[in-house]
Amino acid sequence: MCSTKKPIKLDLCASVKLTPFKPMRPPKPMQCWIHPRRANCKVTRPRNNYSDPDNENDMLHMTVLNSVFLNEHAKLYYRHLLRNDQAEARKTILNADSVYECMLIRPIRTEHFRSVDEAGEHNMSVLKIIIDAVIKYIGKLADDEYILIADRMYVDLIYSEFRAIILPQSAYIIKGDYAESDSESGQSVDVCNELEYPWKLITANNCIVSTDESRQSQYIYRTFLLYNTVLTAILKQNNPFDVIAENTSISIIVRNLGSCPNNKDRVKCCDLNYGGVPPGHVMCPPREITKKFFHYAKWVRNPNKYKRYSELIARQSETGGGSASLRENVNNQLHARDVSQLHLLDWENFMGEFSSYFGLHAHNV
């Protein structure tokens, strides 16, 4: 008879069925005059500042997020990139499975903040403030870091004619570990484990394998976040690409928008309702790679399946040979690998036109 005792397993069902106690009362009602169409944020003015002429315009903005967007230090992932914060102060309040992310905003006397949602912004100097804020924010990401934004496909912020403030994001920032073939020494480098001794003896950070194609895919995804943030700000209607929350197929959206009359391979965004003079065909993105962006964005639904999504945008098809020149098959059609290269080149040309229109330098995008 074996004398080894079996380990005791806890009843996981009890934890699943448990209703957590929330030490903080949920704020009611959830009303936000900056975001009237949202149900997860609230803005209020501190009453004790009404007698202070310097702070009478202070605003407290709170966003309710899910606790899954906390990192190993119980800090929201999006705050990892806040190096030069335009908000006066931020406070994270944990409430069981909810996170209340609060911001103190201190406007100057003539400053008025607006959301990018259906803003219809047409002032080019203000748009450059928005663009600069987005570039500086996502520019803090390291080469082996991967940002994935849930619920929307743009960087959420509020802005005025003087500055832009990054709002709380439902986002992951996943650390990558260079693959063996990518490391200079030919050996796997352990850059992932950031825990200190002795805690790293118990557990380690969960990293994905970082490859050339995964890093390229992530970089291109970031450029789409920039483009879509600007599109959201200049539209006076709902962004047609805001389909993640509604769980609508991107193929249906692209088909409903139609093809741009100037280029049949691009999505027709030239006839949308803009706040100012329509920008022509500058905002009409390439169709095929736009679909890839939204397939790539599904990664946020299951971050552990990085092998399926991390290289999706820049991944070369295995169809066809390995020649660098464009090849044609018996039907006079390009091989799938060459087509994917052309899609990437088309996106690069599109972002070049985008940068020229908004007066950006190529190295900033």
From Swiss-Prot:
Any matching Pfam family: Baculo_VP1054
Localisation per UniProt entry: Virion
Keywords recorded for this protein, A-Z: Virion
Domain of life: Viruses
InterPro entries from the UniProt entry: Baculo_VP1054
Role noted for this protein: Structural protein that participates in nucleocapsid assembly. Plays an essential role in the proper localization of the major capsid protein VP39, and the minor capsid protein 38K into the capsid assembly site.
Subunit comment: Interacts with C42 and VP80. Interacts with protein 38K.
Descriptive protein name: Protein AC54
Natural source organism: Autographa californica nuclear polyhedrosis virus (AcMNPV)
